[in-house]
C-alpha cells in the first residue's frame, strides 16, 4: 500500500500500522470489540525456584496508533474464567524433559497493559503466575518417562494469548488548585456497598 495513503488513514483514525518482527497478524472476528494476539514462540512462564511470579511475553510486533488512540492489552475472557491454557513440561534430574501434559488450565493471568500512541518498540503481554497448580481438561494428553524433579508451564507457539482493545485517550491539562467539593459523594474503597 502507498505510504502516503497509509499515513492519511492513520491520521484519520481509520487504520493502525502493524510491523511484524517475528510475530503474527492479530486475529479479529466480525465486529469483535478486540483483536487476539498470538504467542510467537514457546514460552516458559515459571521456573522451579519461582512458583509464582510475573513477567512478560514478547509478541514480536510493533504498532503505530492513530493520534488520540491507546491500545489496552488484556486477558481473553476464557482465560480469566477458566485459567490460562498451557502445557506442563516435567523436568528430570539432568535438567531434561522427562514428560508432559498438554492442554491444562492454570491460574495465570494476563495483566492489563497500555500501548501509548507514541510507543514503537515491541509490544508484550504482562502475566502473573498465581499458583503452581493446574487442572487437566478433556483434551489433555499425558506422558511421563521417569521421575521428575519439577515442572514448568509452557505457552505454546500460536496460542491466542491476549486481547487488544483500542480506545480513545483524552489528555487534559493539569491545573493546581482547590477542588469543588459541592458534589463530593464521600466514602472510598468499598463504601458504596454490595447491594
Where are these regions (language model features)?
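DUTPase catalytic domain/fold
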Residues: 1-195
Amino acid at each position: 500500500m502507498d505510504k502516503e495513503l497509509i499515513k492519511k488513514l492513520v491520521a484519520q483514525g481509520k487504520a493502525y500500522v502493524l510491523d511484524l518482527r517475528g510475530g503474527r497478524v492479530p486475529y479479529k472476528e466480525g465486529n469483535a470489540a478486540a483483536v487476539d494476539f498470538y504467542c510467537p514462540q514457546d514460552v516458559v512462564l515459571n521456573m522451579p525456584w519461582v512458583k509464582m511470579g510475573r513477567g512478560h511475553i514478547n509478541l514480536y510486533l510493533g504498532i503505530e496508533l492513530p493520534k488520540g488512540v491507546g491500545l489496552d492489552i488484556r486477558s481473553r475472557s476464557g482465560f480469566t474464567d477458566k485459567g490460562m491454557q498451557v502445557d506442563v513440561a516435567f523436568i528430570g534430574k539432568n535438567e531434561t524433559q522427562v514428560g508432559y501434559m498438554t492442554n491444562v488450565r492454570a491460574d495465570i493471568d494476563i495483566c492489563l497493559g497500555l500501548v501509548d500512541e507514541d510507543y514503537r518498540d515491541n509490544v508484550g503481554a504482562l502475566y502473573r503466575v498465581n499458583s503452581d497448580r493446574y487442572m487437566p481438561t478433556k483434551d489433555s494428553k499425558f506422558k511421563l518417562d521417569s521421575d521428575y524433579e519439577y515442572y514448568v508451564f509452557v505457552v505454546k507457539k500460536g496460542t491466542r494469548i491476549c486481547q487488544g482493545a483500542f480506545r480513545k485517550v483524552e489528555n487534559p491539562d493539569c491545573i493546581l488548585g482547590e477542588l469543588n467539593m459541592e458534589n463530593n459523594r464521600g466514602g472510598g474503597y468499598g463504601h458504596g456497598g454490595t447491594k
